[in-house]
């Protein structure tokens, strides 16, 4: 179990207990999690996408150190059975339906996702996937969090589903009174040709559609932060942030807790901000209704958030994108794209395909 940020990783050595909740948005549960922590302990947490959906927190002790790779055995020849759902054509139809609803004025933006199910023989090994994520770094925030309780001896469970990934998106970080967020919204697939790659990056910065999509997210986060923060600062125009497969528009936001050290913990802040329009939409309720209608129960833990909090309330949470759920031989990947007026269904299929490719490569798929 680990959470890596930049070049540092926190690795849990022992799981003391696990607290589940049927509603990851419950602030009382978050307060109980933080209150349960002793000196030197952290809670490694995961929240589902939807309000009223599960959350969990593993109370752990561990250590923080420079990133290092896991020891691996020899390469293993594997066969893969890959299922894409919805299919690209079905996803394009979902986008068209969303655009029709946007045209009525019922909503301004909605994020729609699709999945890959990968079944490998022999089964993939979690440490192998984490090692590849730490090596390739498709996102700054690498994580591995079991979705079941730890073993009786205090170790992480040997079986059961595990949430793994490498997210490029910081939901929130609390360091004392300092609060940071870096929302991403608006993206374009990268190109292997340097000139074309630069052209795409420049085009993204000038895209009215993508800038509008990004503005929805920044406005929502700033509005939420005003409930608990002062001195909120952010640039007038977004920056470019790149992964190995995608260019993103990003806006770094900084603020200070208004209530000082008695302000909300990092876990409470994650609940306050999540889900942002970067994974949901605007207005929130209307977008969530469209997501439930068109996606069904596709998301589960995807497009949620994952991270840690300590006894002082400090911590760091990333948005659960560029992620997979591993369960035995099966690995499910998820990627989404923001749909606004002017979105092109074929372009959104390509964008989600590029995002899925980030995680597909770490499974060993060509």
Feature-to-residue mapping (PLM):
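A generic N-terminal leader/anchor concept
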Residues: 1-52
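An anion-binding catalytic pocket shared by soluble metabolic enzymes
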Residues: 2-19, 114-212, 216, 227-233, ...
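A short glycine-rich, hydrophobically flanked beta-strand micro-motif that places a catalytic Asp/Glu
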Residues: 43-47, 110, 142-145, 300-307
């Amino acid at each position: 179990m680990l959470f890596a940020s930049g070049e540092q990783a926190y690795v849990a050595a022992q799981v003391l207990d696990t607290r589940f909740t049927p509603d990851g948005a419950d602030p009382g549960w978050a307060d109980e999690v933080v209150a349960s922590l002793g000196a030197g302990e952290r809670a490694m947490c995961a929240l589902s996408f939807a309000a009223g959906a599960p959350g969990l927190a593993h109370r752990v002790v561990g250590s923080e150190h420079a990133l290092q790779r896991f020891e691996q055995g020899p390469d293993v020849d594997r066969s893969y059975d890959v299922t894409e759902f919805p299919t690209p054509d079905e996803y394009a139809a979902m986008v068209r339906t969303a655009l029709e609803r946007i045209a009525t004025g019922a909503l301004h933006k909605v994020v729609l996702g699709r999945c890959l199910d990968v079944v490998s023989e022999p089964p993939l090994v979690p440490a192998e996937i984490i090692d590849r994520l730490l090596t390739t770094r498709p996102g700054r925030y690498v994580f591995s969090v079991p979705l079941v309780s730890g073993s009786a001896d205090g170790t992480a469970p040997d079986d059961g589903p595990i949430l793994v990934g490498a997210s490029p998106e910081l939901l929130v970080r609390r360091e004392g009174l300092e609060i940071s967020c870096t929302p991403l919204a608006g993206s374009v697939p990268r190109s292997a040709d340097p000139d074309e790659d630069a052209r795409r990056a420049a085009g993204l910065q000038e895209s009215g559609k993508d800038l509008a999509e990004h503005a929805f997210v920044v406005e929502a986060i700033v509005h939420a932060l005003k409930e608990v923060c002062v001195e909120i600062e952010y640039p007038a125009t977004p920056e470019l942030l790149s992964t190995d497969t995608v260019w993103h528009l990003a806006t770094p936001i900084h603020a200070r807790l208004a209530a000082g050290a008695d302000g909300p913990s990092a876990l409470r802040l994650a609940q306050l901000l999540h889900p942002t329009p970067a994974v949901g939409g605007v207005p929130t309720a209307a977008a969530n209704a469209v997501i439930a209608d068109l996606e069904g129960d596709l998301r589960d833990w995807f497009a949620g958030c994952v991270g840690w909090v300590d006894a002082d309330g400090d911590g760091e949470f990333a948005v659960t994108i560029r992620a997979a759920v591993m369960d035995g031989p099966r690995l499910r990947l998820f990627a989404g794209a923001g749909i606004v007026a002017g979105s092109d269904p074929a372009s959104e299929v390509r964008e989600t395909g590029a995002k899925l490719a980030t995680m597909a490569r770490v499974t060993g798929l060509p």
